[in-house]
């Protein structure tokens, strides 16, 4: 079966890059992922940030690690939705990876990574996506 990746769920063992972006070496992935999970588990219950900001932070952090050969963007968007669900959001929010604004927001967050990871533009995209899904839902209700 051509095109099927058989290493799903397994951290990558080779270097990867996308465009001009070179991601961390495979040797650092497991430790960095454990650190991300610990940081999220400490951050989530105590933060005063909006759910959109937390979702954007986790999405960007995950795709920056780029732990898998394929599917990192999809998994990051699933994690962003997991954050929103943890705040009581009832619907998944479709965050389009094909959107130029989405790509731009990831690059902006990369640019400010050393200064504390400014993911506010990405949070706004998630907020707008959420607004669209709720607006669509409400417009289809028969009141």
Curated annotation (Swiss-Prot):
Xref: PROSITE patterns: FIDO
InterPro entries in the cross-refs: Fido, Fido-like_dom_sf, Fido_containing
Cellular component terms (Gene Ontology): membrane
Limits of the Fido domain: 1-128
SUPFAM superfamilies referenced in this protein's UniProt entry, alphabetically: Fic-like (SSF140931)
Segments traversing the membrane: 49-69
One of the Pfam families matching this protein, by short name: Fic
Subcellular location: Membrane
Transmembrane helix found in the keyword field: yes
Membrane topology label: Single-pass membrane protein
Top-level taxon: Eukaryota
Matching PANTHER family: FIDO DOMAIN-CONTAINING PROTEIN (PTHR13504:SF38), FIDO DOMAIN-CONTAINING PROTEIN DDB_G0283145 (PTHR13504)
Protein name, entry field: Fido domain-containing protein DDB_G0283145
Lineage of origin: Eukaryota, Amoebozoa, Evosea, Eumycetozoa, Dictyostelia
């Amino acid at each position: 079966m051509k095109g099927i990746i058989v290493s799903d769920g397994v951290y990558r063992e080779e270097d990867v890059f996308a465009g001009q972006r070179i991601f961390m070496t495979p040797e650092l992935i497991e430790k960095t992922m454990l650190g991300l999970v610990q940081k999220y588990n400490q951050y989530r219950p105590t933060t005063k940030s909006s759910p959109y900001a937390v979702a954007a932070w986790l999405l960007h952090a995950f795709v920056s690690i780029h732990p898998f050969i394929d599917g990192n963007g999809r998994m990051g968007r699933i994690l962003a939705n997991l954050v929103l669900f943890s705040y009581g959001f009832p619907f998944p929010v479709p965050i389009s990876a094909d959107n130029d604004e989405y790509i731009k927001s990831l690059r902006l967050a990369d640019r400010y990574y050393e200064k504390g990871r400014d993911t506010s533009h990405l949070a706004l995209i998630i907020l707008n996506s959420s607004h669209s899904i709720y607006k669509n839902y409400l417009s289809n209700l028969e009141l």
